[in-house]
């Protein structure tokens, strides 16, 4: 992942080859404090001062605020891939991502609200994080085959799906692992409870949750995706801080990491006042049963001049605690 090969990259290679047991890599990292060099500290302070002169008064960067150690609770990240940028226009992440992206009526962004609505009717929809991404660099996330289809990258599934408007409901049921049925029949009576907790639990489960197989849920073909990915929050119309910092961070990552690492700008992931916000997704490989595992690391308060330091410490299996929001292991 880095131009200077590190033990961190070697571990990823071993995992892909199936020579290492599955594990949450972030739990192996050593958390360290951070005593910034005078040069880095001065560079960050100058950047913040310059940026704050360009930002509204109610959207200033404040480096003194402590970063909360909090990330969303989720088991899947579903990302709508924005169409390619058009020459002579603002990039998609700047011109097409309105403050509340799910209210955008234009295709393919209108797919977000539709999928969100139907995920509420599914077994595991509650734990699915949904965003839009604008791909800045990738050899595997090419252009869509049709403008009439929305493309979604799903992690940890490691799949790219193309979905038409008429398929959005079925797609939501597919990624949400089946539709939850409304309870039917008589109410549960006191006599049912006398049969014991196990019996009543089975009765409720039988009533409420439809089996995926029984429901005849539609399946979706997909393109395989097995890359590592860095997401930088750049939801410009929601908060200008991220919108200003994101392209600068992307430029730094492009210069400092190898070309097989995919880079994308992502819509709102929380914590705009702690911009820049960065997510590292590291593909760990497939288990014997075909399930994929992905490790995620969330960071905040990353400024362009801090990128080399962040990468240097990650290369030594170290996490700089003041910049770390949290992390988790995702399993398909």
UniProtKB/Swiss-Prot annotation:
InterPro entries (UniProt xref): Aim32/Apd1-like (IPR009737), Thioredoxin-like_sf (IPR036249)
CDD domains: TRX_Fd_Sucrase (cd03062)
Transmembrane segments: none
Family the UniProt entry places it in: Belongs to the AIM32 family.
Official protein name in the record: Altered inheritance of mitochondria protein 32
UniProt organism field: Lachancea thermotolerans (strain ATCC 56472 / CBS 6340 / NRRL Y-8284)
Organism classification: Eukaryota, Fungi, Dikarya, Ascomycota, Saccharomycotina
